[in-house]
Curated annotation (Swiss-Prot):
Taxonomy of the source species: Viruses, Monodnaviria, Trapavirae, Saleviricota, Huolimaviricetes
Segments of skewed composition (Acidic residues): 10-27
Taxonomic source organism: Halorubrum pleomorphic virus 1 (HRPV-1)
Superkingdom per UniProt: Viruses
Region (Disordered): 1-27
Name of the molecule in the record: Uncharacterized protein 2
Length: 126
C-alpha cells in the first residue's frame, strides 16, 4: 500500500459502466417475507423486466454482497418521488400491514401488502 494519504471518497472520479447488458449472475436473489427488510446502496435500477415489466433493484449490502429483488409500484413510486437513484442508500421493508383498494369497474376490493422505503439524507440535507 502506498504511503500517501488515502483520498476522500467524494474527491475520487466516478467510473462509468460501459457495459449496457444487465447481468445479475453474481447477485443473490431475495424475496422479503413479511417483517423482513434489506438495507443497501442502489447499484442498478432495471425497469421493464420479466413477464409483467417489473423493476429489478440490485442493492449492495457490503463489499461483494449484492442482492437483487423484484420491486413493485409502491417502491418504484417512492424512489421516483424522492429522486433516489444509483449510489443512494435505501432501506426497504415488507411490513406486516395490508391495505385494500377497489379497481375501477370492479366491486371486489383487492388486498395488497404494504412496503416501507427509507433513505439516508433525502433531499441532500448533508
Amino acid at each position: 500500500m502506498s504511503k500517501s494519504k488515502t483520498p476522500n471518497f467524494d474527491d475520487m472520479e466516478v467510473l462509468d459502466d460501459t457495459n449496457d447488458e444487465y447481468d445479475d449472475s453474481e447477485s443473490e436473489w431475495i424475496d422479503l417475507d413479511r417483517g423482513e427488510s434489506v438495507v443497501g446502496e442502489i447499484r442498478e435500477i432495471n425497469p421493464d423486466c420479466g413477464d409483467y415489466g417489473t423493476t429489478v433493484l440490485e442493492l449492495s449490502r457490503g463489499l461483494g454482497d449484492n442482492v437483487c429483488m423484484w420491486s413493485n409500484r409502491q417502491i418504484d413510486n417512492k424512489i421516483e418521488q424522492h429522486g433516489l437513484g444509483v449510489g443512494e442508500v435505501v432501506g426497504i421493508k415488507h411490513t406486516d400491514r395490508e391495505q385494500t383498494f377497489t379497481p375501477d369497474g370492479s366491486d371486489e376490493p383487492v388486498k395488497f401488502d404494504v412496503y416501507e422505503v427509507r433513505a439516508v439524507n433525502v433531499g441532500g440535507n448533508d
